[in-house]
Every structure is written in C-alpha cells, then in structure tokens.
Amino acid sequence: VISYIMKFRKYDWDKWKNVEVGDRLLIDLKFSNGFATVKPIRSISKGNDTPFKPSEALTKQTILLFDIEIFKHDSLFIFRDYFTKEWFIINNDLDELRKFYLEYRDSMFIGYNNASYDNNVMRGYLQGKNAYQMSKTIIESDNRGLVYKMFDSHKTPLFGMDLYQDNKGFSLKEHSAFLGINIKETEVDFDMDRPLTDEEKEKNVAYCMNDVLATEKRFEQNIGMLLAKATIALMFDMDKTDLLQTNANLTAKLLGATKQEVRPDLTDPLELDKRLNINTKEIAEAYLNHEFELNEDGKLNVSLEYTDEDGYTMIFGSGGVHGAKASYIHIGMFPMRDWGSLYPNTMEQFNLLSRNIPKDKIHRYGDLLKQRMDAKYSGEEVANIKGVEVPTYVMINGIKLPLNTKFGATGAQFNGLYDPRNQFLVCATGQLIMTNMYELIKGKAQFIQSNTDAHAYIPNSEADDKAIDEALDEFANKIGLTLDKDMFREIWQKDVNNYIAVQPNGKVKVKGAIGLTGGMKVSKAIVSNAFINYLVAGKDYKDFINECNELRQFQIITKTGWTFDRTVARDSEGNEFNAQKVNRVFAVKDKTNAVELLSLIHI
C-alpha cells in the first residue's frame, strides 16, 4: 500500500514522524465517504528494501482555473486547464468530482475568493457533507474561522492561489467589466427550493464558465504575484500550500513570527536617534519627549499641520508626511529626491522590526534587503535559487513581496508580526527622516511637494542645487539609507495625491484617480486619457475623443454597495426594472433612450 502523509498537517505528522521508509506496520484502515484514513498501531519490523519511489508524479499536475455554483438541490463545479484550455464540467455528480480530485489533487487550483469559499465548500462536499449547508453557513456567518473548524474541511488538501487576495479592492465582476468582457449575472435564484430545470442548468453552466474565463484573465494580469510567492516558497523551503496564504501571513511564516500580547511600552516616548537632527520646534514637540496618545480606534497617532514662513504646508499623520502646492503647474527641470524602500530600510537600520520575530530568524529580513539590492545591480539575467534557475527580475519581485508586506503586517491585529508600537515607530522615524531632509533643503529651494518618502523642489540656483545634493548624500550615508534623484521637466499638480509629471526622456508619471489605478480601472477612461494627452502631448481633447473607436474607453462601470438591497433602472418614461449589481454604462445624446440607475434600501 502506498500512503501519502501530509507533513503540513501536524495531527497526521505526529502519528507518522517516527516511521521510517520501508517499515512494516500494523495499521488501522478505515474508509469514509470514499477516502481512506490510515492510523499506524505499531511497527512489525524494519524493511530491508526501500519501496519503489516513482520518478514521475502519480497524479496530473497543471494549473486549473475554477468556480463553483451551489444551490439547495444542485451543485456545479467547473474547471479549465490553463495550458490545454480543456473544460471539465461536473454537474450534480459527487463520484465524478471525487475521481477528478484524485486525478488532479497535485494541481494548482486558482479561483477568486476561493480561499474562504470555493475551496472549503468543495472540500466538504468531497467528504460527503451538504454543499448547500456549507455554502450558506460560510456566506452568512460572522465567524468564518469557527465555520471552517466546525466543518473540518481542511482534512482534504487543496493547493492553489486566491486572486481575491490581491484584488485592488475590486470584485471579479468589476475586473470583468474593466476588461471589457461579459458581466451578465445569473438569472437563476440560488435559494429556490427545487431542482434546477434543464434550461436553468444550461444558464448556470454558461454563467459559471464566464466567471472561470474572467478568473483566467485576472490570473494573467496577476501572474507576477504567483511567481513572487513561488520564489519565496523556494527560497525558504516552504510547502506549496503556502501559496494560498495572504502576503502578510506568508511573510510572518518565513520570518518565524508568532503572535504576542501587546507590550506595556505601547505609548512610551520616542527617543530621537543620534543620527537625526530635528530643529523645527513644532515637529520636535509633536514626536519627542512625551508619551503618545491613542486615538478613538485605540491606535497610536500623531496629527500635526505645519506651515513654514514661506507658506509651505506639510501634514503629519499615521499615513506619513504629505505636502504640496495646490493647483500648481511648473514647466522646467526640477529634481525629486526619494528614499529607496524607506520603511523596509528604516526597520532594518533603526532596529524596528517586529519584536515577535525570533532571534535566530531576525537576520532574514536584512538578508533579503541585501539580496534584492545585489540582484538589482548584478547585471545578471538569471539567478540560481537552490539549483533552480529563474529570471533575475522574478527573484527581485519575489523578494519585494515580504519586504513591502512586513510594515503593514506589523499593524495587522491577527498576524504573527503584530507589534503596534514598532509599526508606529517606523512611521514616526520615517517622518523625522523626512523632516531632517526638509531642513537640509529649506532656504535653498522652493518645495513643490512632499510625500511619504520624497521631496520635490526647485533649487534657487545651481550652487544651491549642488549644496543640497552634498548635504543629502552625507545624511543618507549617515543613516544607512539610499537616496535616489529623479529629474522631471514639467508637472501638473492638483495636490500631493493627484498629479502628472514628465521626465526628460518623455516618461510620464501619473498619480491619483486620473491614472485609472495603473491602467487597470478602465472606467471613464476616455476622459482621463484625453486629459493626459492634452497636457503631455498637446493633443486637442476633442480630436482625441472623436478619433477613439474603442468602445471600452467610453464605458462607465458602476457597482451597488453592500449596504443596498438591490439596483433598479428607470427609463425616460418612469418605468422601473431590476438591474445588476455591477453595470456597464454609456452616455447617450438622446435623452429618450437614457436610463437612470438607482440603488435601493428596503425600510
């Protein structure tokens, strides 16, 4: 008998950890709902010959995009092989689903919100549990962790990735709308108390297949995240099941962090590091030589609005320091000096990593920072990770994942890295670094903007520009951080969070809603693109709009929030009909053809 023991399941591993390959055992073998449970009773003898170990996987290994639809009397599971594009449609057939699972259980199952919903419903259904009952309980429960324990669905291993974990705040239907693909919602009532008709089953299959195709498109947009997680798993000998973890939990695991109670020094005063020099009285008083207060949410916070004698205002808060000349335009060369990975390097250089990381693993974060910088400037196209060759850029992006996730995870209450004081001190120290930097520039330049990790300014003269660079470079060396210098030739600025800046080589930097979330949020895109092209290229916005023949550029994507019960559309004559939660809307010139969308709450 060949039995697979899942080492990542502590309960199983404790029973098998002292058993050697080749041992002859007396076992207790039970079958439940088509699955075997093997419990070792005692060892009969040690084996002389090591059993045959297959050189190839005994099951199929591929990437499967999938989605499920669960009704009271029907269940639908649809899978699509990413490489062969083959569909697998399993409708009301538990035995067929079990065969499929056993054949593909070593494959990667990729869905949208599958970590909390689809995976657990499918696992429970494979074990013979009521799929509808599990579905309703997961959807309606306020304590999903308790639900998962109650159904014990993790007994059936499932490997994969949840695209919802990096969804940029959008639902799958919204992503589908942005991509210009079908967003039609199902017309079949999930709570009907009867089996589906053949026609309803066909509609349900079509709806589900469409969601799988949308998941595939989103996967292709986000494949870098899978590669990043796989890189980290390879570097730290992690199990492939860890790919399903959130970035924050994955980071906590590789750093060996375990949850601790909040320490009693939470509000203790901040002692200014000897490498920093703060002369601005108001800022020094806000951060130094007193205990900190907790805000109404029980979190540490400093709130300060500081305006200097030149009228330049900077706002200090839990999100960093921000300042900008409002409604400002500048045509002409100017520098933006920004810190390389300010928070990650501040944590390392100022000893502000989470105190939940054990001493024997605390070096890992600094090692990753160094590895990333070495790889970035190595000039090598390929990196070797434990005998596996990967493109260097893939390794760099993989290392960025824990480096950039660590700060946020330190403030996540249920994460192993949770250390609210040190998270606050990272932010506060970063703001003091920015203040020290501001003081070195002040008097020698006019400030354009200040954000979390950068100051943009116009030097008063070439001599002042040189003096600023010398002072800033000396300061950067003193605190052990890297300070970059990017040049720009023009900027159009609404505020610090909304601006368009152009570099000498013509590369455009867009910040804020006008940038359509990095080009992902294709809603009212024609307005944003016409505006950017008018400013940057001098293109007449009317010509730009009239020359555009891509319908998707004109779409307006709307979504009814969860606080509303339903969406209705009202035509020009006042007639109302139900609309979808997510809708694709277009402007029309003829008002008689127009409809109005309304979100309703039942009172």
PLM region spans:
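Residues immediately flanking
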Residues: L29, I68, N113-N114, L163, ...
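N-terminal accessory regions of nucleic-acid-interacting proteins
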Residues: Y11-W16, G22, I27, F31-Q61
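Conserved "right-hand" nucleotidyltransferase catalytic core of DNA-directed polymerases
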Residues: K7, K39-G47, F52-L58, E69, ...
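Conserved DEDDh/DEDDy metal-dependent 3′-5′ exonuclease domain
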Residues: F79, F83-E174, Y207
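A short acidic (Asp/Glu
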Residues: D74-I78, N119-L126, N345-E348, I458-S461, ...
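Gly/Thr-rich phosphate-binding beta-strand-loop-beta motif of the actin/hexokinase/Hsp70
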Residues: A57-R80, Y343
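Helical catalytic core of nucleic-acid polymerases
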Residues: N167-L172, G180-N182, E187-E199, D310-N436, ...
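C-terminal, non-catalytic extensions of nucleic-acid polymerases
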Residues: I396, Q431, T435, D465-I601
